[in-house]
Amino acid sequence: MHPMLNIAVRAARNAGQVVVKAFSQPENIEVIQKGSNDFVTNVDRDAEAAIIHTIKKSYPEHSIVAEESGEIAGTNPDYQWIIDPLDGTTNLVKGIPHFAVSIALRVKGKTEQAVVYDPIRDELFTATRGSGAQLNGYRIRVGKAKELSGTILATGFPFKQK
């Protein structure tokens, strides 16, 4: 595994521990409503802090763009980590076990490494540019469908109105 992907995996798992603990203790979740069904919680902030700490420990010179903290400039602008510490905050708040930790690394403007971790199911999706994607260490492939009919599509709808 690429060393930077390894750090992303470690960071995602660390954040996942924060999220799972909070999910099992909903009375400790502090919620601020930003808009209709748009929340931020102490869990978002704590998970983000765990990710940032893990990345900065290994790569202090890298930049980070995080959902809650915004941009944290590093001394090497070629490396930029993109973090969504809790994708699915609304589900967490409502007790629905469908959320994930998402981390990507851009190098010179191109996404090179990515991790999506579902801490409830312990499903770890990883991808490296040019090497495909994996689920829990096993290669995954896309279907062969050429038309949208006959496929399964899942999406989330953003809460911000345009």
Language model features with spans:
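N-terminal subdomain of lithium-sensitive/metallo-dependent phosphomonoesterases centered on the IMPase/IPPase/PAP
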Residues: 1-86
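Short capping/connector residues at structural and topological boundaries
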Residues: 34-36, 44-45, 97, 145, ...
